Amino acid sequence: MACKNPKKFFPICNSPILRDGALKGKVALVTGGGTGIGKAIATTFAHLGASVAIAARRMEKLEQTAEEIMKTTGGICEPFRMDIKDPGMVSDTFDKIDKKFGKHPDILVNNAAGNFIMATERLSPNAHGTIIDIVLKGTMNVTTELGKRCIQSKTGASVTSITAAYARSGAPFIVPSAVSKAGVEIMTKSLATEWSKYGLRFNAVSPGPIPTKGAWGRLFSGEMGDVAEKMKELNPEGRSGTPEEVANLVAFISSDHMSFMNGVIIDLDGGQQHFNHGSHMGDFLHTWDQDTWGDVENVIRGRTGKEKP
């Protein structure tokens, strides 16, 4: 049973937990930094004094976000167009960041992702390949590019990847994402043991239900306006999390205060994974018939401009 009074017992506190200037002198790169959780992380970093680079494919949105962050925080935030699936573009972007800030990032947050809910038998090879290319291969591209530069320059860095509890538990209807995020978590643990000798550390944050327009817009069709409320009912604390709560945790992990934290996967989900096995909506989605799946497929097809998801 979910808590009936989350405002009293589990209040939301979105203000930064670290002191002002805690990340001063750091250069932070946040992939997928234009919206949602990535935007919240970038905003918190800027508030704490870091010089922030946000990267994604849509430059117009990035420019809007960077301007908003600088206006809100008085900090530094620069947008960079980068497709993490393209290793050459990733390398070029790191060159631009180095030129802009005088060094490569001290902090990397792998937040860029792709996902949608769909019955697995309806997925084309292109559909699951696209998710794997973004979430797993893209994250590897960015992480290894930073790692090589740190090793060459003999400088350290903190890398935090945003994953999900279903990377460990598995979950129906989001198989490509589960496979990819599982790979990211193994990458995190593996590089923590291999590259610590070079001054790099690697951790991951696994958020529970965090309603954002970008991520939830990819997952659910426009008709599912009750999803957020249903998520609250499925959480022991009786509420969803906020992007700012994730941002606070990521900032703390990325700071020098947590230099001994390495190779750790942290769940920030209000106890969600223990409440219903890490799959927030599995039982609900199993009730969908073929007509409903067809409607969802049409929504995804219209959003991507492709014939099949």
UniProtKB/Swiss-Prot annotation:
One of its GO terms (cellular component) is mitochondrion. Substrate binds at residues 57, 116, 124, 218. CDD domains: TER_DECR_SDR_a. It holds the Pfam family adh_short_C2. GO terms for molecular function: 2,4-dienoyl-CoA reductase (NADPH) activity. Its EC number is 1.3.1.124. It catalyses: a (2E,4E)-dienoyl-CoA + NADPH + H(+) = a 4,5-saturated-(3E)-enoyl-CoA + NADP(+); a (2E,4Z)-dienoyl-CoA + NADPH + H(+) = a 4,5-saturated-(3E)-enoyl-CoA + NADP(+). The active site is at 166 (proton acceptor). Keywords: NADP, Oxidoreductase. GO terms for biological process: fatty acid beta-oxidation. NADP(+) binds at residues 32-37, 57, 83, 181, 207-210. It is an enzyme of class 1 (oxidoreductase). Auxiliary enzyme of beta-oxidation. It participates in the metabolism of unsaturated fatty enoyl-CoA esters having double bonds in both even- and odd-numbered positions. Catalyzes the NADP-dependent reduction of 2,4-dienoyl-CoA to yield trans-3-enoyl-CoA. Belongs to the short-chain dehydrogenases/reductases (SDR) family. 2,4-dienoyl-CoA reductase subfamily. This is Probable 2,4-dienoyl-CoA reductase 3 [(3E)-enoyl-CoA-producing]. The lineage of its organism: Eukaryota, Metazoa, Ecdysozoa, Nematoda, Chromadorea.
